[in-house]
Amino acid sequence: MKVIFTQDVRGKGNRGQVKEVPDGYAENFLIRKGLAKAATPQAMSALRGQQRLEEKKEAEKKTEAEAMKAKIEDDKTVVQIQSKAGEDSRLFGSIPSKQIAQALDKQYQIKVDKRKIDLKQPIRSLGFTNVTVNLFPGIDARIRVHVIEQK
């Protein structure tokens, strides 16, 4: 029996996938528990429509990410962060990705999730640092972060 998986089933199939499974397994387990539904012509056309909608949303997210990348990588976009520092330009504390995301939002009204900022280690010194932001799979932007001494 052909079924359309409505949820991920370990070892059998992923959500949205159409697969051939034994009749008893499909009727007694998958369909009863709501993990899959029978692959009728109506269900197949609904699945195709849903996949087209998801592809459209994905394309919109990609164009939005590309526009954000252009805005971020503009030469004038330099995120300035003030922090207390010692004699040898070393900071008291550090600048984590959360602080960079907040400064980017405050200075340029660009909202970026702190988990998308690829910062191997927090910034611990004054000056310029290039930081990579993963906006979308395959679309990365570089932010210039300028840490200046707070007086």
Swiss-Prot record:
One GO process term, biological-process aspect: translation
GO cellular component labels: ribonucleoprotein complex; ribosome
Residue ranges the record marks as coiled coil: none
Identification of the protein by name: Large ribosomal subunit protein bL9
Cited SUPFAM superfamilies: L9 N-domain-like, Ribosomal protein L9 C-domain
Protein keywords: Ribonucleoprotein, Ribosomal protein, RNA-binding, rRNA-binding
A GO MF term: rRNA binding
Protein's job: Binds to the 23S rRNA.
The organism's place on the tree of life at top rank: Bacteria
Family named by the database record: Belongs to the bacterial ribosomal protein bL9 family.
